[in-house]
């Protein structure tokens, strides 16, 4: 399944790059990678999940992959969490959050 490259606005206006797959009307699943990785870490998983009828979003976290680096050098858990919430708010419906390592911690903080 072909992915569409999408740029989301993160916390503090950062541009965060993602690959989006699947039906735009389906429930979104937001995949967040670990530190030092990129959105491609979730690529094959996202393809499998999208083929099951979900809309998948694999995101490059701030300072990773094709996403912006934070000009104020804020790479705190608070900032990663705020980016997660900002992207989730742009998806049209609440996403399922899936994360590993840094992405997992960010997802848990976003869920409260």
Residue ranges and their predicted role:
Residues 43-44, 72-75, 112:
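N-terminal low-complexity, intrinsically disordered patches enriched in charged
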């Amino acid at each position: 399944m072909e992915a569409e490259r999408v740029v989301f606005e993160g916390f503090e206006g950062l541009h965060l790059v993602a690959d989006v797959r699947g039906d735009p009307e389906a429930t979104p699943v937001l995949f967040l990678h670990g530190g030092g990785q990129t959105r491609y870490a979730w690529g094959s998983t996202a393809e499998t999940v999208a083929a099951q009828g979900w809309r998948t979003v694999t995101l490059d976290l701030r300072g990773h992959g094709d996403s912006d680096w934070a000009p104020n050098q804020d790479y705190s858990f608070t900032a990663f969490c705020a980016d997660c919430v900002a992207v989730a708010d742009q998806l049209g419906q609440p996403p399922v959050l899936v994360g590993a390592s840094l992405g997992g911690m960010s997802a848990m903080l976003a869920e409260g």
